[in-house]
């Protein structure tokens, strides 16, 4: 059975402040706990507490939940990937989680710049547990800019501007072995002052833009054909 102290701690993990204080995340579901692996600190089911539904964040409760330490990836883990995603100000947890899931599917690394807390339970769920597998790091803008000065990475900005080149299935033929995609939010676009070649995804004009995670999926699929 969970103690009152344990329940209080688990409940606190639903907030950014609580996660930061405890250095723990709330992980909901057996598959995600499996992917968290040795990072898991505690697991519990409805038989361990009468307050199970209050301790989790999903409307449809999983059979098991738990707490886990955030993964600790190194910059070398990200640089080792042929494709790196620089995510700029992605604030929707569902979008961030989906992009992390895509990074796992298409073997990419991620740098998070001013994004929503990756420990948000919705990020973890939307990532399908890939938050514990696909390498990522949070960086501030000065650190990103300093890092870019030390690496020779062609930069491609996913954005619809007048000077942007259409992204097509043949784009991968011109891409070198290692590249960096810069991706901004659907509402604000790319706000980080990171120079690069602009690429846009063609679509029907009756909509202004496509969902950012959808755009990343298209770009990564094309990239994966040559990476």
Model region roles, listed by residue range:
Residues 20-24, 40-42, 108-110, 133-134, ...:
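Short active-site oxyanion
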Residues 66, 102-105, 120-132, 191-227:
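Structured adenosyl-cofactor binding patch, chiefly the S-adenosyl-L-methionine
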């Amino acid at each position: 059975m969970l103690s009152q102290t344990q329940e209080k701690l688990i409940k606190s993990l639903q907030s950014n402040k609580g996660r930061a204080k405890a250095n723990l995340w709330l992980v909901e579901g057996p598959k995600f706990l499996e992917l968290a692996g040795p990072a898991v600190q505690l697991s519990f089911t409805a038989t361990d507490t009468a307050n199970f539904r209050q301790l989790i964040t999903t409307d449809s409760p999983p059979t098991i939940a738990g707490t886990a330490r955030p993964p600790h990836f190194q910059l070398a883990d990200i640089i080792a990937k042929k494709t790196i995603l620089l995510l700029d100000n992605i604030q929707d947890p569902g979008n961030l989680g989906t992009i992390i899931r895509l990074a796992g599917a298409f073997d990419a690394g991620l740098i998070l710049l001013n994004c929503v807390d990756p420990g948000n339970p919705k990020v973890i769920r939307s990532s399908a547990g890939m938050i514990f597998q696909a390498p990522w790091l949070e960086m501030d803008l000065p650190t990103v800019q300093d890092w870019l000065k030390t690496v020779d990475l062609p930069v491609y900005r996913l954005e619809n501007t007048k000077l942007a080149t259409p992204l097509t299935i043949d784009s991968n033929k011109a891409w070198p072995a290692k590249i960096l995609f810069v991706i901004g939010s659907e509402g604000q676009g790319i706000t980080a002052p990171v120079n690069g070649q602009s690429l846009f995804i063609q679509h029907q004009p009756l909509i202004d833009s496509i969902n950012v995670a959808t755009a990343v999926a298209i770009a990564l699929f094309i990239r994966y054909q040559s990476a």
